[in-house]
Amino acid sequence: MTNSADSAQPVFSRRSTARVSTDRPSRYGKQLAAHMGRKITTTWDEASQTGSLTFDREGAATGAVELSCHDDILQLHLAADDAHLERLEQVTGIHLARFGAKEGLVVSWIRQEGTPGTTQGPLTPEDLERMRAEREARQGK
């Protein structure tokens, strides 16, 4: 994971929030930050059980997610522009749903105006196998 505390965050026009019910919010928050940190800038603070994901893989940031843990809830606050909001909901949510497939995690986003965003999970073993095969096909394996 890289620390982005010194980098200025751009201002994004759209917001979306997901509250993921789980007995282990800190475990999933830390896992999400560590996994996503291979390709984007992330942080995770064990003491405060908070973190961030900055979607800056291709240079300028296209969105950011703030992670926070509460009693049996992992809360995700996504900020992005119109062009990237739905895709970043999907990318963030599907990773989390995949990590928590055995627990049946569901990530349902609610947009700032109160309208539903995208939903990821719960994932079945068949879903996971299909996703694995699709990923391998994209990577040319």
What does each model-found stretch correspond to?
Residues 1-27:
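Terminal, regulation- and interaction-focused segments at domain boundaries
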Residues 22-24, 57-59, 80-82:
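Beta-strand elements of well-folded, non-transmembrane domains
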Residues 24-38:
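Amphipathic alpha-helical segments
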Residues 31-35, 67-72, 87-99:
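Extended Gly/Ser/Thr-rich low-complexity repeat segments
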Residues 34, 38-62:
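Ser/Thr-rich, low-complexity intrinsically disordered terminal regions
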Residues 59-80:
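Beta-strand/loop substructures that line and gate deep hydrophobic ligand-binding cavities in soluble
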Residues 78-118:
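C-terminal structural segments of small proteins and small subunits
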Residues 110-139:
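Short, low-order "capping/linker" segments at domain edges
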